[in-house]
Amino acid sequence: MKIGITGSLASGKTTASKILSSGKGPLFSADRVVKELYSKNYFNKIIRKKFNIGTTKNIKKILKNKILKDRSNITKLERLIHPLVRKEMAKFLKKYKNKKLIFLEIPLLIESKLMKNFDVIFFLKSKKSLSLKRFILKGGNKELFNVFNNKQLKDEKKIKFCDHVVTNEKSIIVLKKNLLKILKRYE
């Protein structure tokens, strides 16, 4: 069974994914794939060429500034990254096709129209103020949060495609209890 985990920006998807998959099955993380891409020279060369970045240092910071100056750069970046993430996802699915449960954390699952690839989809949500606080703690800022948040579909639209909506506004203990209660139905 393929279980998708998605949600609003900085809603706790990574934490939820780790809770759900822990001891239950393998976990694919689109964010982890993207992070790995940035550590590869070939990818950085592509980024530097596509976005006219001369230096090899602080590429992510320079990209963030370029996105803030010109919102179309998000789409340009997504066109580079998404096919590479999908390729890694296909490898993951092939490798673990015989597992009872597999988990895939994909922030833009709905926007990428990947719903049909999943048996069950969890949606994580939290108040915008709490999500902003989490985003800033991870090194972002309010302006960038708003840019990324406005690029995504509204929660109300995304929720229509999901089987379970989990609000993450309390402790990790409460989140874990709520997630595992739902997951028991599929074990």
Question: Where do the protein language model's features map onto the residues?
Answer:
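The Walker A (P-loop) glycine that initiates the GxxxxGKT/S ATP-binding motif of P-loop NTPases
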Residues: 7, 19
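Post-Walker A helix-loop "phosphate-sensing" segment adjacent to the P-loop in P-loop NTPases
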Residues: 21-30
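ATP-binding Walker
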Residues: 11
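Hydrophobic anchor at the beta1->P-loop junction of P-loop NTPases
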Residues: 3-5
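Short, well-ordered beta-strand core segments
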Residues: 27, 102, 119-123, 165-166
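ATP-dependent small-molecule kinase phosphotransfer cores
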Residues: 32, 36-98
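Walker A/P-loop
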Residues: 14
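Small-molecule kinase domains that catalyze NTP-dependent phosphoryl transfer to phosphate-bearing small molecules
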Residues: 89, 97, 116-117, 128, ...
